[in-house]
Amino acid sequence: MEALARIHAPAKAQFIRGIALELERLANHVGDLGALAGDVGYLPTASFCGRIRGDYLNMSALLCGNRFGRDLTRVGGVRFDIDGPVKESLLTRLEAAERDTASAVNLLWDSSSVMSRFEDAGRISEEVAREIGLVGPAARASGLGRDVRTDFPKGAYRYSHVPMCTWSTGDVFARAYVRWLEIQNSIRFIREELQELPEGALHVSVPALMPESIVVSLVEGWRGEICHVAITDESGKFHRYKVVDPSFHNWSGLALALRGQEISDFPLCNKSFNLSYAGFDL
């Protein structure tokens, strides 16, 4: 809508949006790693990550009063500011969560029984990943460099670069390990954004939308590329609106990853993609 209205959110709003997006990524990546640990019966990491995921969700609640970040953004900017006390609280919580996350997740890589289940399970080659159009961590775990934050940087990602994390083996381990690498990058990004948070307005006014126009918007969600397409009619009202979730692109990847696998490997492969039924049907 901002593109259709020919406006840009203020710099401070863009920073806050970036922080919120990476907090969402942190909560879900940590939750996924905990679930993968649970699927192989490794309860220490499964239990720790369940609690740590809540820590990241509570940071989102500190931003806007909702653990899932609802009502934070608005057309033209954001609804909530990050003042001094909130900033200091976020930095303190982030440091504690970073330490706890590292302790919990590194247990996985140090466990031979976990690694024997993760490695070589559900392989997707880079060639296949490219042919079927995988996106997000699933694509990057197969060595396919594809990330909206790098390929089409917008908002806060124009000011602060997030390194793209890839792995080459394309198995359950790779999809788990890419999440761990991205967790570390997201924490560094949030810390940098908080320390360099600019002053200024939180939002701008929104004029009428351009008539008879089409806009394509891309965001790198925690599952991968999210695409919104909007078309307006002659009066500037929506004529068509379509959302494409990462699950739409990645479901065939899960199907291919399961070929030739043991039945006991299904939960691992399934959770390593962690797709959305509702997202696929959008």
What are these regions (language model features)?
Residues M1-L282:
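Active-site bordering "gate/hinge" segments
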